[in-house]
Amino acid sequence: MVTVDEVRKAQRAQGPATIMAIGTATPPNCVDQSTYPDYYFRITNSEHMTDLKEKFKRMCDKSMIKKRYMYLTEEILKENPNVCAYMAPSLDTRQDMVVVEVPRLGKAATEAIKEWGQPKSKITHLVFCTTSGVDMPGADYRLTKLLGLRPSVKRLMMYQQGCFAGGTVLRLAKDLAENNKGARVLVVCSEITAVTFRGPSDTHLDSLVGQALFGDGAAAIIIGADPIPEIEKPMFELVSTAQTILPDSDGSIDGHLREAGLTFHLLKDVPGLISKNIQKSLTEAFKPLGISDWNSIFWIAHPGGPAILDQVEEKLGLKPEKLRATRHVLSEYGNMSSACVLFILDEMRKKSAEDGLETAGEGLEWGVLFGFGPGLTVETVVLHSVAAA
């Protein structure tokens, strides 16, 4: 008879979890950031608020965002004026949209599965993450049906985590892949701003910040350990993960589900809190590897906004090119909450291949991925870039 210890050993993978494929998707509706203030104040019937509109224009100008993608079109908003008001009861309307559209945007998974090159029947686990809406059965169930995954796929649904969750899903997928031999984990982050969109208020400027930054997008990755040679192509190994709540950060980023949808609250010192504490997270993550030069690693940081990136860059003395991929994704898509860091991974590996570099991590061996969000919570993931075949 076998022992429990022998069973446990047999269940575990030999190598580290690796990212084998990445896919992304956005709604077709693209909005230009330079013209967005005019559109936003017109569609919300707020053109009389001229001073506030000027403030919003400055926010959009400073956002470093060129364009964003949004499910909410002018037609949809005209049909649902309660979504355009500042705090009108509108949760039912919003829920009706996101319950359908969040899993549908998860079609990014189709791209990831295609790149992976294995039949979808080999997916053993699904981790689905969204801050857009809540439902039972969840978006994980709906996506399983949409993709035609096996009914026995082991699902984990994460709702209402916020912007740090791109790191959380990697942490969970790493544990699943390494502790279940042969596991292939499909991870999907799908975010739609239909839950947070609302008209302006001159008494709640933090809500306006969200209107200037957030965009819609979904990203999917396939994670597994012990890749099959010649069939699966590993890009990044997930070496270690950590999560922490920053000191003295209570209430710095909050979101509350109300009759008016998901409300967003932000303190001005968020960039300061992150930049003040980031060195500690880096030291704890990289000390075991003997790395202390933050310019010697590749960077994937959740782009909460340009001020966070600027202050992190300044605090750590990072060269401008270190946050190139991060700033590129912010510029092209805005802040897509949990999906952002996965978009940045995709951008980095594509540009690295384009430039003929030796690894998917800008030619470097080691890298870091940061998620920042409500709490204030920080997720840290140490990545090892696999040499290009």
Swiss-Prot record:
Coiled-coil region: none
Pfam family, any one: Chal_sti_synt_N
InterPro entries: Chalcone/stilbene_synt_C, Chalcone/stilbene_synt_N, Chalcone/stilbene_synthase_AS, Polyketide_synthase_type-III, Thiolase-like
TM stretches of this protein: none
EC number: 2.3.1.74
Pathway: Secondary metabolite biosynthesis; flavonoid biosynthesis
Keyword Repeat annotated: no
Similarity comment: family membership: Belongs to the thiolase-like superfamily. Chalcone/stilbene synthases family.
Primary role: The primary product of this enzyme is 4,2',4',6'-tetrahydroxychalcone (also termed naringenin-chalcone or chalcone) which can under specific conditions spontaneously isomerize into naringenin.
Name of this chain's protein: Chalcone synthase 1
Organism: Citrus sinensis (Sweet orange)
